[in-house]
Amino acid sequence: MKNLVRLLTKKKLKLSVAESCTGGMLASSITSISGASKVFNLGLVTYSNQAKIRILKVNKNIIKRYGAVSHQCCLAMVNNLSKISKAHINVSITGIAGPKGGTKQKPVGLVYIGIKKGKKVQINKCLFKSKKRSSIQKATVKKTLDLIIRISK
């Protein structure tokens, strides 16, 4: 965590996040580090579909057609967050942390992580094997931090 804050500070980059299944854990992890105010711009928890639609302006047809846990929804979340926040790096997370809510097509542990830096956008599909909610959330935060560091270098 300290490495991320140090790297973003050195590069003079601002970060914003929109979280769903992690419920603010990513923002909390980053802002727990002294100096985070230099790099952390905005943190949103858009847990419900309505929050994604109202706050992040995700088109309701995307959620209806593909679901909130999808590549398409994650992409809309990160693109629209970047319009709101004007940060250099924007991150979106949507997934199924469990222990319930999974299906054969979308099992518990399925998470999409979107990262946008400038015009470059990447959507990462992850499947965390744990059935424990907290383990999936922690693994998602760790993976997201690694991705942010990688794109920031």
Give, region by region, the residue ranges found by the protein language model.
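Short alpha-helical segments enriched in small residues
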Residues: 1-153
